[in-house]
């Protein structure tokens, strides 16, 4: 589902928000590069207007309270523009609808830029269709390793991973998993963590070019 946002109705509450609305800042990359904290969801909506959301998991959570048993819904949501930006978030509420909205907001605040490239040695297409190099992420007992794949392979990963990859704009990937991968939450978080690790690997401009990674 694509989310709607009305720029005209937005009244920024922060200096960063005002710079975005005034058109001084026109790219989310500018904010990421400067390391500015994003305090308004509207900043994400304005700079990434084509974000889509997907519910990854809905779970009923019970806990004991002095007034009795409390029941909440815990929802995991992924958002992305299918072109290099993806986020993962969690929301809790007594009803599913509010829990989803909280999870969407949390996912927006967790948006990252995903490094993509043509990292498989057998593929020289030069498109940013896969991960540029092997990378791993973990959450709890789950460890997910993403491996570059040539064009046409598709997403060789579990359904939860497929959703996150698709929203990130990755078309082809091999994967290897360990741990309790049937635990949806940890599988999603480990996959997202692997994508985050892509940006933490230091590489020269020459190496990035060889891997088909766009430096802009």
Curated annotation (Swiss-Prot):
The gene designation is rps5
SUPFAM superfamilies linked: dsRNA-binding domain-like, Ribosomal protein S5 domain 2-like
Checking Gene3D superfamilies in the record gives: 3.30.160.20, 3.30.230.10
Q: Which Pfam families match?
A: Ribosomal_S5, Ribosomal_S5_C
Domain remark in the UniProt entry: The N-terminal domain interacts with the head of the 30S subunit; the C-terminal domain interacts with the body and contacts protein S4. The interaction surface between S4 and S5 is involved in control of translational fidelity.
| Family from the record | Belongs to the universal ribosomal protein uS5 family.
Oligomeric state and interaction partners are given as:
Part of the 30S ribosomal subunit. Contacts protein S4.
Q: Which organism is it from?
A: Methanothermobacter thermautotrophicus (strain ATCC 29096 / DSM 1053 / JCM 10044 / NBRC 100330 / Delta H) (Methanobacterium thermoautotrophicum)
Q: What is this protein called?
A: Small ribosomal subunit protein uS5
Could you list this entry's UniProt keywords, alphabetically sorted.
Answer: Ribonucleoprotein, Ribosomal protein, RNA-binding, rRNA-binding
Q: Which top-rank group of organisms is this from?
A: Archaea
Instruction: List the molecular function annotations (GO) for this entry.
Output: rRNA binding; structural constituent of ribosome
S5 DRBM domain boundaries: 51-114
Among PROSITE patterns, the record links this protein to: RIBOSOMAL_S5, S5_DSRBD
Name the job this protein performs: With S4 and S12 plays an important role in translational accuracy.
Task: Report the InterPro entries cross-referenced here.
Answer: Ribosomal_Su5_D2-typ_SF, Ribosomal_uS5, Ribosomal_uS5_arc, Ribosomal_uS5_C, Ribosomal_uS5_euk/arc, Ribosomal_uS5_N, Ribosomal_uS5_N_CS, Ribsml_uS5_D2-typ_fold_subgr
